[in-house]
Curated annotation (Swiss-Prot):
Domain FtsK: 174-387
Protein name as catalogued: DNA translocase FtsK
Annotated family: Belongs to the FtsK/SpoIIIE/SftA family.
Gene symbol of the encoding locus: ftsK
Compositional bias per record (Basic and acidic residues), positions renumbered to this chain: 518-529
Residues annotated to bind ATP: G194, S195, G196, K197, S198, V199
Job description of the protein: May function as a DNA motor that moves dsDNA in an ATP-dependent manner towards the dif recombination site, which is located within the replication terminus region. Translocation stops specifically at Xer-dif sites, where FtsK interacts with the Xer recombinase, allowing activation of chromosome unlinking by recombination. FtsK orienting polar sequences (KOPS) guide the direction of DNA translocation. FtsK can remove proteins from DNA as it translocates, but translocation stops specifically at XerCD-dif site, thereby preventing removal of XerC and XerD from dif.
Assigned keywords, A-Z: ATP-binding, Cell cycle, Cell division, Chromosome partition, DNA-binding, Nucleotide-binding
Species of the source: Haemophilus influenzae (strain ATCC 51907 / DSM 11121 / KW20 / Rd)
The organism's place on the tree of life at top rank: Bacteria
GO biological processes: cell division; chromosome segregation
Additional note from the record: Although strongly related to FtsK, it lacks the typical transmembrane domains located at the N-terminal part of FtsK.
Annotated InterPro entries: FtsK/SpoIIIE/SftA, FtsK_alpha, FtsK_dom, Ftsk_gamma, P-loop_NTPase, WH-like_DNA-bd_sf, WH_DNA-bd_sf
Length: 529
């Protein structure tokens, strides 16, 4: 097709899409799907990638082993290669050091050793769990891709007993690495631009979407970049639309803290210690036909005349794609909210995944690090950044494109993992599949600020002004005959307090009657004023 050259003085012709006011480039591309019959997405939504047949040969392994031993001797380090593990991205040569030789001596010459061996970079593993050796990890000439489908289709993922299983990728030996977010219980992720951090976060999300139902796990996603997580909008797991406004993101974290305190009150009332015990007790009494009334309900909290029955609590996973932007807007406030959640939220099922491309001490503060013991480092710019996230070096020598170091809770050992890969189309396919299964049940008020609500109340009480939504709500009530506060909340996406205030204003205007036996009547039509 030949490109059409426009005269600089000629106005563009927009008649080609005259049937719509919106250019096709700006229209949301929605794929209509029938509701799937399976309880969870099919692996067929993920692509099969052909394996790379170019692998390292035994002769190459032997040659590199001899070169490593020779170059170490040149640096007055006596060692011999005892074992070799060939992975998808790197090969680890396990060496036995002569008695009296410190592993730190090899680490101190890693840059010189990489230059002598003519590798882009190498990483020295001073400790290999269960072995008396050190490891020298060298990049493979022909890198293997790790498709997400291969990891999710593995026995390790299928048979995992994890509550919140996350597939990270494959380790040095090519074995899938599956971790449990519920046991972490929070995760800090850092990596420079192009390191594969965003793909890694998507891998974690898709792992959960392949294992959990919306009634069991809910997401709050915070996306300062606007484009990274917006693909998940309207999936049924969301508690609120993907948050892109950083001020509203602070409100979402504040809501999480309030929800944490509310859940602890419920656990205390039922005399259980964690979310698992709470849900078991709810199931137990429901099986006996004795639903448990909400012990912290107060008259006026809802329009009900009696306390509603308790339901099982769902896990909540809070994902922040660029934590540094959030800290720039409200650093001290955000730090305190994150610290409170990290300290206490584990037992009641709220878990954090915080990702940043700037692992500096003003972003990952000491207070945050102390309360988030599980970390993942993709490629970073310097040893200082590596120490900031992992408390040790190594991440600066990674190879990018999903190459990562994982440090689990309570362990100083680092696991090198090659992250799973999926395309943007695969992410869209899975999100569309979940959207076809149902709509999200958003909770009003998550993004609202308590200060805004208080100022709104003061403005109405002092000046007597009607709520800006008053006319619309009044028309809705008169036309539908519905006088419940909950219906106003759902229709206009407002919190309970605001909806109740509008209902009170309609009562003052004589449009609806006072509450009688939990109901109101419509008394008149639109007033003249």
């Amino acid at each position: 097709m030949e490109a059409v050259q426009l005269d600089k003085n000629q106005e563009p012709n927009y008649k080609g899409y005259s049937g719509s006011l919106i250019h096709p480039a700006f229209q949301q591309q929605t794929t209509k799907r029938e509701k799937p019959s399976t309880p969870l997405p099919s692996l067929d939504l993920l692509l099969k990638y052909p394996p790379n047949e170019q692998r390292i040969t035994p002769d190459e392994i032997m040659e590199t082993s001899q070169r490593i031993e020779q170059q170490l001797r040149n640096f007055n380090v006596k060692a011999s290669v005892k074992d070799v593990l060939v992975g998808p991205v790197v090969t680890r040569y396990e060496l036995e050091l002569q008695p009296g030789v410190k592993a730190s001596k090899v680490t101190s010459i890693d840059t010189d050793l990489a230059r002598a061996l003519m590798f882009r970079s190498i990483r020295v593993a001073e400790v290999i769990p269960g072995k008396p050796y050190i490891g020298i990890e060298t990049p493979n000439l022909h890198r293997q891709m790790v498709p997400l489908r291969d990891v999710l289709d593995s026995n390790e993922f299928r048979d995992s007993k994890a509550t919140l299983p996350i597939a990270l990728g494959k380790d040095i030996s090519g074995k899938p690495v599956i971790v449990d977010l519920a046991k972490m219980p929070h995760l800090l992720v850092a990596g420079s631009t192009g390191s594969g951090k965003s793909v890694g976060v998507n891998t974690m999300i898709l792992s959960l979407l392949y294992r959990v139902q919306p009634e069991d796990v809910k997401f709050i996603m915070i996306d300062p970049k606007v484009v990274e997580l917006s693909v998940y909008n309207d999936i049924p797991h969301l508690l609120t639309p993907v948050v892109t406004d950083m001020k509203k993101a602070a409100n979402a974290l504040r809501w999480c803290v309030d929800e944490m305190e509310r859940r602890y009150q419920l656990l205390s009332a039922l005399r259980v210690r964690n979310i698992e015990g709470f849900n078991e007790k709810i199931d137990e009494y429901e099986a006996m036909g004795m639903p448990v009334p909400n012990p912290i309900w107060r008259l006026g909290d809802t329009m009900d005349a009696m306390p509603p029955a308790l339901k099982k609590l769902s896990y909540i996973v809070v994902i922040v794609d660029e934590f540094a932007d959030l800290m720039m807007v409200a650093g001290k406030q955000i730090e305190e909210l994150i610290a409170r959640l990290a300290q206490k939220a584990r037992a009641i099922g709220i878990h954090l995944i915080l990702a940043t491309q700037r692992p500096s001490v003003d972003v990952i503060t000491g207070l945050i690090k102390a309360n988030i013991p599980s970390r993942i480092a993709f490629t970073v710019a310097s040893k200082i950044d590596s120490r900031t996230i992992l408390d040790q070096g190594g991440a600066e020598a990674l190879l990018g494109r999903g190459d990562m170091l994982y440090s689990g809770q309570g362990s100083s050992d680092l696991i090198r993992v090659h992250g799973a890969y999926m395309s943007d189309d695969e992410v869209i396919n899975i999100a569309d599949d979940w959207r076809a299964r149902g709509k999200p049940d958003y909770i009003d008020g998550i993004l609202e600020s308590a200060d805004d609500e208080e100022s709104s109340e003061k403005g109405i009480s002092s000046g007597g002004e009607l709520d800006p939504l008053f006319d619309e709500v009044m028309d809705f009530v008169i036309n539908t005959g519905t006088t419940s506060v909950s219906s106003i909340q759902r229709k206009f996406s407002v919190g309970f307090n605001r909806a109740a205030r509008i209902m009170d204003q309609m009562e003052e205007q004589g449009i609806v009657s006072p509450m009688q036996n939990g109901k109101r009547e419509i008394l008149s039509h639109r007033p003249e004023y």
